[in-house]
């Protein structure tokens, strides 16, 4: 079959590419695997997506959906070739309605651009992954993306009120809408959010907005070590505070950040905590003072306080530099996003230190302390060496097994993709895995949507 020719006939040549350069650019994400598709399709509307899937369904052609392509787990790698369907051109903010408290967007809208647009009107879309300047709403929905502020405000799923989805056979389904409360039928929205492109393709989303908090304060505190910072997280929450963010960092990450950004950026100390509070001005000031005193009581050394938006954003920018700082070390960063019950934070870091000694692989820990989602990154030297890679995989196996034994999860926001496929049955359990497969077969009987990922052998 002449796949490019057939698709060109359906969509027109301006939406179809077989260029080597284009196919290579759409062969993977930020993970280590890649595979060229046979053809790349640039959908511009729901009708384009519907036509492509109807054709692919009839002809048993694999279709891998791609948003911004900046995931960390190989979720958009077209393992079986076929068609990569890019939603990058579907990048319109269709509507923003303060009256209804919603925004209607296409999947290619960049998350940070949506935030800017709604904040200009005095509203907010809280989910804020570190890659918000690059990532798309469609990708966020596919992985149920989180971010630092999900402690108080929740993850992407908490903001999806409605979806337009094209099913594997090309039929278009709508579920939900502009209603902030709706219990009609099954929670189909919850089924598609986090489904990693394996059950259908989202072509439009209706997202919940909230009034933009009028004031905020940030406290960035340095501690003697990571356990002291982790214990402070518990102290803050036990005292009745619910910050919008609680971000923790270990010594390895801090040292890498000092090298990239300057030694003066982070005062001496081997643990670091960022606390953000938002709300009404008087309440924020009062709570900020209480937390400042609590940080001191818990052993914090230097505490930086920011009250203006510009100062607060400067602290967030430092936090967003952590991943880049770790890459600057020259080591390969295996970007893991495990989750443990909040009470196990200190145990997790102690286990990571033990694992580092046993394997000789450096481990850098930072992330969302408030919800137990810590990026436990293996920093590997000479990762291209097969023996080294095998040692790193063995270390990951030890880490994931420990996390699951403690009641945790192997991924909190990046998704499973290819990277965590070897551990999915262990993570889900036999019965849950079988239910996942049953749902997949019901919605995609020919298995054309994002094949080769965690539900396939």
Regions found by a protein language model. Give the residues of each.
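N-terminal flexible segment immediately upstream of the FAD-binding catalytic core
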Residues: 1-54, 70-101, 130, 253-262, ...
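C-terminal substrate-recognition/cap domain of FAD-linked oxidoreductases
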Residues: 18-21, 26, 207, 211, ...
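N-terminal accessory segments
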Residues: 1-30, 58-61, 294-312, 405-410, ...
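FAD-binding subdomain of flavoenzyme oxidoreductases
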Residues: 92-96, 101-249, 449
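Conserved, mostly hydrophobic/aromatic
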Residues: 56, 197, 444
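Short beta-alpha connecting loops at secondary-structure transitions
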Residues: 91, 98-101, 384-385, 419-425
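Activity-critical C-terminal alpha-helical subdomain
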Residues: 171, 421-457
